[in-house]
Amino acid sequence: MRVVDTHFHWFPRSHFETMANRGSFPRTERVGDGYRYLYNEGRGFIPLPAVWFDLDAGFSASFSATGPDTVVVCTTGVLAGMLDQMPAEDALDEAYAYNEEIARAQRLHPGRFFGTAAVPLQDTAMALKVLDHAVGSLDLRGVNLPSMIGSETVDASRLEPFYERVAELDVPLIVHPTDLAFNEVLTGYADGIQRSIGRLLDSSVTVLRLIFSGIMERHPTLRVVQTHAGGLLPYQAGRIDKNARIEGLPRLPSEYLKRVFVDTVAPQSLTIRTALEYYGADNILYGTDNPCWSPQAAVSVLDESALSDEVRRKIYSTNAESVFRLT
């Protein structure tokens, strides 16, 4: 059985080098044989050891857990927010360069590696131009959405043409935490609050904005993929329906939420079982967060979840093949 890891991180080293040469934030700085990413005017940073740009090491870790037929879908992850903190022209150049490198890896590893696009959302026209190139010319299989675009949220009305175009192109919109929201109250404890709860809050609010704003209502074919088993949302769906009656929405928020696809990056089987019960087996995608989490650990959690053969096949393979058009 082909296994599709939908939550895999790899970056071309050229991207980190370009960001290291920037004179202002966001940027990276060289640390030994790796880097660290500095954002929010330098108040936040993420260590980026060499494994982040070692694709062979990423493949090796995946194969050791799920065998040589493993396929990876590469997402920008936390760094999706990097472009949207930059001046628009700089972001345009870097988005093109990044997407070209991701597409190059896809060509070098056909059927093994699939890439997703970064776009400069601070300028809608630029974002549309980059999106069309990434999907139409480079054959990338999705587009990444940060939690914030500068000081704007993802439901800014000017972004409506972007969501319309994503739906028309029939590629998924990937919502991964970007550490750009709520930073003032998530500090301290060696980033323990940010990394444990903050990132889930970040992506959960992003998805709620897509729902409350009517974006998912206006674009019923838009496929949204939320990482980390749906963050906080499946556990509070009843409260969301109770407290958030949105004028103009013909359905309860939870009805849109159940359209969302979520991955299995969650270090306990209880979370997986809850996600399965809430979203249904057709909406769950296998993911490892490699290199941030161990593929072996990701498999162990699913093994502990007592899945039927049919559900395992959907999670490990067929759902992702459909969402990312891999067949």
Where are these regions (language model features)?
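Helix-coil boundary/capping segments in enzymes
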Residues: M1-T327
